[in-house]
Amino acid sequence: MIKIYDTMTRSLRKFVPLTENTVNMYVCGPTVYNYIHIGNARSAVAFDTIRRYFEYTGYQVNYISNFTDVDDKIIKAATQAGVSPKELSDRFIAAFIEDTKALGVKPATQNPRVMDYIAEIISFVESLIEKDFAYEADGDVYFRVEKSEHYAKLANKTLSELEVGASGRTDAETALKENPLDFALWKSAKAGEVSWDSPWGFGRPGWHIECSVMATEILGDTIDIHGGGADLEFPHHTNEIAQSEAKTGKTFANYWMHNGFVTVDNEKMSKSLGNFVTVHEMLQTVDGQVLRFFLATQQYRKPINFTEKAIHDAEINLKYLKNTLQQPLTETADEQELKQFVIAFQDAMDDDFNTANGITVVFDMAKWINSGSYTEPVKSAFEKMLAVFGIIFEEEVLEVDIEALIAKRQEARANRDFATADAIRDQLAAQGIKLLDTKDGVRWLRD
């Protein structure tokens, strides 16, 4: 039984899907104006792992993750680069797909783009105005937060608490608002900006409305899980809830999940602090699976500290798991012990997708395998566990028949033909195969 920590209720809750054996997930994707950094990648990897575990347990997952392809940051970066916002966003969407593929992230069921949903966004805003949840002011449209019952319930704050923090704002946009907390659903166009015609004049969508529209258009008024980084809890997800539930009158998402930050020297990795490294840069020197494994070593809600040592440790541990998978099969293994490993793994992952505990089970199982318990069922179970973490090793085509050469070497040794035996060992070593002579016979692994 899978239990999820739901940010809305601040509690572990049994997962009950809206539709039996199906999970509908929406995860906020990147604003595509630059390469993603390791902190951004954590969200992609964390929710991919969650998706994979749902699939491991037999669920069909509809996994939707958007691309924000129109935004203030995109417009600014496109202007600086001398290209259109679409050209810039297309470039970095391609880069995102390439980077996350290297991290073993499965393609989403759909990756909706904001620019493809402008008509639906306008219709959504019109509906909110009709219901008196929104109002037009000088070409902008704002959401009335005071009309939203339990606004900011996700952030566990009251409207009065938030109003205190907003009371000192004096910018031009705030002057148009009925309440400083009211947020933009539609922004009037500025000279030279990308824009679309609407009942309120030329403009473009506000950030928060985009995800509400794409999520409900694709998955319906209520979805099972909405996810994203912890920094999206307020205001982004808070505003999504307010506008979505105002329009439909229904619960927007049954479970809210938020991943923790990647930190550097215990500070959040971010572009604004300048303490970030992009995935694109890291992949020049570090294998994508190593980065993936590093990001999986901590339970998704907890922060994870990025250090060279942590990456080095991930590389060593990944190599150990690969060598374990490449052990020769044995004839027997304790079926009950195998069953216990599978149960322990599921218990760990059922507990809010605790990858740290799940990986501990994987290494305990690897130790057991390396002690001589590696039948085909054991191998299959082990590979399925690793696949949950996105660890999938492709079968390498050998130029030699390893087992045949080992048998030939054993025969040479029995005949005291040590020159031939040594030559075979050298031949295997050239193929990256290391031989281990044990009291139970010869074992081999890839070096």
From Swiss-Prot:
Domain of life: Bacteria
Co-factor note (free text): Binds 1 zinc ion per subunit.
Annotated EC: 6.1.1.16
GO biological process terms held by the UniProt record: cysteinyl-tRNA aminoacylation
Protein name: Cysteine--tRNA ligase
InterPro entries in the cross-refs: Cys-tRNA-ligase, Cys-tRNA-synt_Ia_DALR, Cys-tRNA/MSH_ligase, CysS_C, Rossmann-like_a/b/a_fold, tRNA-synt_1_cat_dom, tRNAsynth_Ia_anticodon-bd
Keywords of this entry: Aminoacyl-tRNA synthetase, ATP-binding, Cytoplasm, Ligase, Metal-binding, Nucleotide-binding, Protein biosynthesis, Zinc
Biological source species: Streptococcus pyogenes serotype M18 (strain MGAS8232)
Compartments, as annotated in UniProt: Cytoplasm
Cofactor annotation: Zn(2+)
Motif mapping: 'KMSKS' region: 268-272
Positions with a binding annotation for ATP: K271
Ligase among keywords: yes
Enzyme class: ligase
Short motif ('HIGH' region): ranges: 30-40
Major site of localization recorded for this protein: cytoplasm
One of the record's GO cellular component terms: cytosol
